[in-house]
Structures are given as structure tokens and as C-alpha cells.
């Protein structure tokens, strides 16, 4: 899979102190849709000026994680989307690893990485395996497989 088939969606709510590290870790040739759950026009201008690959959408109010992600995913024009938390940092090989998996398993719906444990030990699982749930900090969507909404908007989640 080529990078032009991937977009990143990030939901924020007053995350100015965290978002720069996240955005700085994303390759600049990947489009990013940042959905800010507020009406902070200054934040939007600053982000879009600093990161030309980022489109910042202001919701006007805090609609929650599910609604905001659905707004962002609805704007994606690529086949795949990576939903990412604003405090997540993409390591150098993360995108490439996702792309390798899409080449191997082109019939997938969702893919998620194994994250660091609370004690900061890194879990290295180079093989793929099925799980019952995914951690929400980074979810890789095959948008071709989804029909309808992505997140259940009855759940506000954390934001």
C-alpha cells in the first residue's frame, strides 16, 4: 500500500500542550484531519499554519470522542485511516508496519498496535493475531469495509 491511500484522524479537546509532538511524528505527506471539540479559531490557525498537511475542523462544542471521530472519518478521502490520540507519537516504522499488514491481509476491518505497558516495557509482537478489543490510542481502519458510522455516538467516551 502506498502512503497516498492513508489519512490520519485526531480528535482533540484543549490538547495544545500535547498535539505538536503527535503531529511532528506524522510524515508530512500524509493528510491529517484534526477535529477540535471547541470553537478555538486561534488554535485552528496556528495548527494549519504550522502543519500544511493538517486540516483542522472546529466542532464549536465538545461533542465527545465518538462524534468527533465520525466527523473526521467522514472527511477522509483515502482507503485507509489511522485514528490517533493527540498524545500518541508515531515511531519511525509504525506506518510502514501498518502498510505491510494491509498488503498481507487486505480483507481486514481494523488493525491496532500493541502498546507499551505502564512500566514502559515495549511489547514486540512481530506476528499478527486476533484480539477481542483494540486500544483506542491508535486504530487503523479499512474504510472500504465500513458502511454507516464508525463509532457509536451514544458513547461520549473521555473527551
Per-segment meaning from a language model:
Residues 59-76:
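Glycine-rich, basic loop-to-helix element that forms the pyrophosphate-binding segment
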Residues 25, 36-45:
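A conserved acidic beta->alpha catalytic loop
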Residues 88-124:
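Conserved donor NDP-sugar-binding/catalytic core segment of glycosyltransferases
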Residues 138-148:
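Conserved nucleotide-sugar donor-binding
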Residues 30-39, 57-59:
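Short beta-strand/loop segment that forms part of the nucleotide-sugar
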Amino acid at each position: 500500500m502506498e502512503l497516498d491511500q492513508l489519512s490520519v484522524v485526531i480528535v482533540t479537546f484543549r490538547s495544545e500542550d500535547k498535539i505538536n509532538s503527535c503531529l511532528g511524528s506524522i510524515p508530512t505527506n500524509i493528510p491529517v484531519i484534526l477535529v477540535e471539540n471547541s470553537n478555538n479559531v486561534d488554535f485552528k490557525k496556528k495548527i494549519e499554519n504550522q502543519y500544511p498537511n493538517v486540516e483542522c475542523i472546529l466542532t464549536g462544542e465538545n461533542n465527545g470522542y465518538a462524534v468527533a471521530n465520525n466527523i473526521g472519518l467522514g472527511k477522509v478521502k483515502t482507503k485507509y485511516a489511522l485514528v490517533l490520540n493527540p498524545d500518541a507519537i508515531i515511531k519511525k516504522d509504525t506506518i510502514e508496519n501498518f502498510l505491510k499488514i494491509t498488503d498481507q491481509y487486505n480483507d481486514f476491518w481494523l488493525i491496532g498496535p500493541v502498546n507499551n505497558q505502564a512500566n514502559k516495557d515495549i511489547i514486540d509482537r512481530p506476528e499478527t493475531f486476533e484480539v477481542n478489543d483494540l486500544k483506542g490510542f491508535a486504530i487503523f481502519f479499512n474504510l472500504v469495509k465500513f458502511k454507516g458510522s464508525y463509532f457509536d455516538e451514544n458513547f461520549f467516551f473521555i473527551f
